[in-house]
Each structure stands twice: as structure tokens, then as C-alpha cells.
Regions:
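Nucleotide-activated sugar donor-binding and catalytic core shared by glycosyltransferases
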Residues: 1-249
Length: 249
């Protein structure tokens, strides 16, 4: 993502605090002074989770399968994902009527379009996406930080990305230097979770990938767990040491 920035690092920064393991080789290659400190989300999301209490707090069923839907954090994302997600929800509920589908949004104003029309048939929860991810069996997630959160929580997921033609053209041709868009796949450099992009983002395709992911749930969760471990640094105070090193100069 925006690879060209690395050429400016030495002139702009005394030291880079790296959050992801794959950044190390890149920074070494260009002679950048850095310390790998791990990702703060890996630690903050690593505590024990009381599923029963959390489900009760969220008003969710204790025994039903839970599918989480995270359509994005921006209105433009939600608009592009609105119809395919709506089509997926209708099909999944028809085939699996006992499943509880939870739509996690940042704020009430994000509830729009066809998803709003479905709000009577699904559970809509605001400003609690991490909690929803913590208790779900699988998530359908718009690409972004939420894919990392779901990965750290070892939750199987299907990642979707749909934007307008110009945005996708610029992203694909000028900024993105990896074949993956989901952070768990980027971190592992293999396709652990399904990614659907642009014309692939349709209800039928999402449904198909969700079914396949649920069948392979255990294997996916184990691979995601290993990614979380790679984001946890062995020294709990490594971040503090890196900061002290900078200010001691």
C-alpha cells in the first residue's frame, strides 16, 4: 500500500515503530531505522471472553449460530455493499432460519437502503463491532481494520470490497502492491480467508463462500490464531524501550 512512502522515511523520521512482521524486510531493504513492536490490537483483543455475558449484554441468543455483517465504516462503502449483503441475508435466512444475523454499524445514520428494510428481520447493533465479532461464528466484513480485528479473534470471515470504477482503478494500479486485500491474507501471504472484489461481490457468491468457510471453520481459526501470535511481541515493554531510545539521543 503506497510503497513509494518508504523512500521518504529516513529524511522524515528518526525511527519507525513497525506494527506488522512483513514490514521488517521492506524497512531493512531500504536501510530504515525501525523496531518491530507488534500490533496493539493483538494484545487488547487477547483477553478471555465471557461469551454468555457478552451475548446477554448485546441481546443475542445464547445457543443460535451467529453471523456478523460489517458492511464498512463509511457511507460510500455501505451503499456499494448494500444490495449484495441484502441478497445474501435473504438467502441465508431462507436456508438457515434459526441463524441470528447481526448487522454491526457505527451509528444509526449508517442504516440505509435495502439493509434498512431488513432491519426487522435481523439484529442491528451500533458502536460495538468488536463485541459482535467476539461472539459470532463467522463474519462478512468489508475490507479494512475490521478484518484484522476478526483475524486476531480467530473468527472465520468472508471479506468483500466494492467501490466505484475510478476508486478501484486507482487503488489497483497505483497504490496496492499485494495480491490480497484482507490483512490476515496479507500477513500470512496465503489465502486463508475468501476475498470477493468488485463484480464478485454478489449475494450468491457471498453465500457460497460463507458456507465453505463454515465447513472449514476449525482450520481457518487455527491459522488465524497463528497470525495473532505473530503480532504479539515477546517483550511487553518493547514499545516503551523504542520510545526511550528515541528520546535518549
Amino acid at each position: 500500500w503506497r510503497y513509494s512512502r518508504v523512500y521518504k522515511f529516513n529524511s522524515l523520521y528518526h525511527k519507525i515503530l513497525s506494527l506488522f512482521p512483513f514490514e521488517s524486510d521492506l524497512l531493512k531493504k531500504h536501510g530504515v531505522n525501525f523496531s518491530y513492536v507488534g500490533h496493539p490490537l493483538a494484545k487488547s483483543l487477547s483477553g478471555d471472553i465471557d461469551d454468555i455475558k457478552l451475548k446477554r449484554d448485546l441481546g443475542l441468543s445464547l445457543n443460535r449460530e451467529i453471523i456478523a455483517i460489517l458492511p464498512g465504516s463509511r457511507k460510500s462503502e455501505i451503499k456499494h455493499h448494500d444490495k449484495p449483503l441484502s441478497d445474501f441475508i435473504k438467502k441465508y435466512k431462507k436456508e438457515n432460519p434459526d441463524t441470528e444475523i447481526v448487522l454491526a454499524l457505527n451509528k444509526k445514520s449508517d442504516l440505509l437502503g435495502q439493509l434498512e428494510k431488513l432491519s426487522g428481520d435481523i439484529k442491528v447493533i451500533f458502536d460495538a463491532s468488536q463485541k459482535v465479532l467476539s461472539v459470532c461464528d463467522l463474519a462478512v466484513v468489508a475490507s479494512g481494520t475490521a478484518t484484522l480485528e476478526a483475524g486476531i479473534l480467530a473468527k472465520p470471515m468472508v471479506v468483500i470490497y466494492k467501490s466505484n470504477f475510478l476508486s478501484n482503478f486507482i487503488l489497483s494500479n497505483f497504490f496496492l502492491k499485494t495480491k490480497f486485500i484482507a490483512l490476515p491474507n496479507i500477513l500470512s501471504q496465503e489465502k486463508i480467508i475468501f476475498e470477493l472484489r468488485q463484480s464478485q461481490v454478489i449475494g450468491e457468491q457471498i453465500y457460497e463462500k460463507v458456507i465453505l468457510s463454515l465447513k472449514n471453520k476449525k482450520n481457518i481459526s487455527e491459522k488465524l490464531e497463528s497470525i495473532k501470535q505473530s503480532l504479539l511481541v515477546s517483550e511487553s515493554n518493547k514499545f516503551t524501550k523504542a520510545i526511550q531510545e528515541i528520546f535518549s539521543k
